[in-house]
Amino acid sequence: MKNCNQAINSREYKLILNINQFYDRTHTVERFGNLVGSLTQQFKGKVISQQTEEKYRHIYYLDTPNFDLRHHGFILRIRREKKYHQPKYQITLKHRESDRYLSASQDLSATKPGKTKFEEDIIPPFQSKFSQSISVTKDRQPNFENIKQVAKLFPGLKALDIPEQTSIGLVNNFRAFEVVKKLANLQFGDKHIVKTDLSLWYLNTTDNLPLIAEFSLKYRLPKKLLESPKKLEQFPMPMIQGTNYLFKALQQQREWINFHPMTKTAYVYG
């Protein structure tokens, strides 16, 4: 195990919404965005920019037949999206754990250049989980056939002692078409930004009603603090307080909230 004393560099608050609100996506997104803006102003925040961008991605998860990765707290996710009119494949290995030190101690190194993240995920009413991840982007679709091939990219998986020839395949034969809708950038009392977006999963591109709808509020540690070892995890207090108030207020909007939520990963694994 590596050093478990890692600093959190981002926080993400997640709400699973009532999918029955989303028959008309354009109208619903506008209504929900207005609600977020109104509540933000109640807590002395402001909307500094409205977003109109939609991203479209295809997503699937890979695991062994017995879900060995999942049982060890890992997920292996593939995202396909077009960038500059060319398909790109983002391969993400993530470890999620209630104990931040156990999550931080995992070896998520890669043999190719990748983007790393150690973040706190917050779900209702206010429960934290911690995830460490690394994402590697490739021009071609990955073709993993067994654990040995996955561990060639992510060598830390060798420590799980899963037999090398254990096959890897699509989890529950499930693929999602994802629409990511950027909503707005928010500020609470200072210049730091809280980003908001909606993630909607569909079985097909033509479906009207999503399988799952997730709203997220997220912020990263400002760059100047990331680069200062003496100021690690010093998230600005006005941003924390405002985001917390908004997150709790949204949970009171009964028509919008799914009170028997299932995360996206849980949905895939069933």
Task: Report residues per predicted region.
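Phosphate-end processing signature that detects enzymes handling 5′-triphosphorylated RNA
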Residues: 1-270
